[in-house]
Amino acid sequence: GSSNAASTMVALNRLWDINLDTENLIDIAKDEGADVPLFIFGKNSIGRGIGEKLKSTDSIEDNLLLIQPDIHNSTQEMFIELDKSREENGFTINSNQNDFWDIYIKRDSIVRNFYKQNSSDYNLNLSGTGSCIYIRYNEKKELDKILKKIPSNWRFFFCKPLQYSPICYI
């Protein structure tokens, strides 16, 4: 949904010759959804705040294994849980881990077990608020163990990340 909203905003801005710059589009986009600004920014970045404070990061050259568990994950519910967690435990910043990881693995026992079985051998990462998990790798043979442990009702894909969003070229 968020990438669709951003794509629509960028396309209409260009098609209708509104000519808003990226900064103004991002300012409008933050009212449309937490990660819409990220998609308007259009390049590898780290988001802060509700996703509207963006800082470019180095390009990701690694290959990715994208794992899609067979569960639905509500973005709204994840933000509610994150707010509750911060109220109870205080606010901490760990730039090396997605803030939603701990919440995500508590929500589903199969995901939690998968994480426990594989996190010591692989650097598991969460995409956004979930539900996709990704692992960076160089050679597919590095993934032999984990591919055997992915539940049969989960999907997985071998990917290469784009360095810029295709909407940057509209």
Regions found by a protein language model. Give the residues of each.
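DPxDG-like acidic metal-binding loop motif
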Residues: S2-T22
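ATP-dependent small-molecule kinase catalytic core of the GHMP/sugar-kinase superfamily
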Residues: I18-N123, R136-I170
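Conserved glycine-rich beta-strand-loop-beta hairpin in the small C-terminal domain of fold type I
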Residues: S131-I133
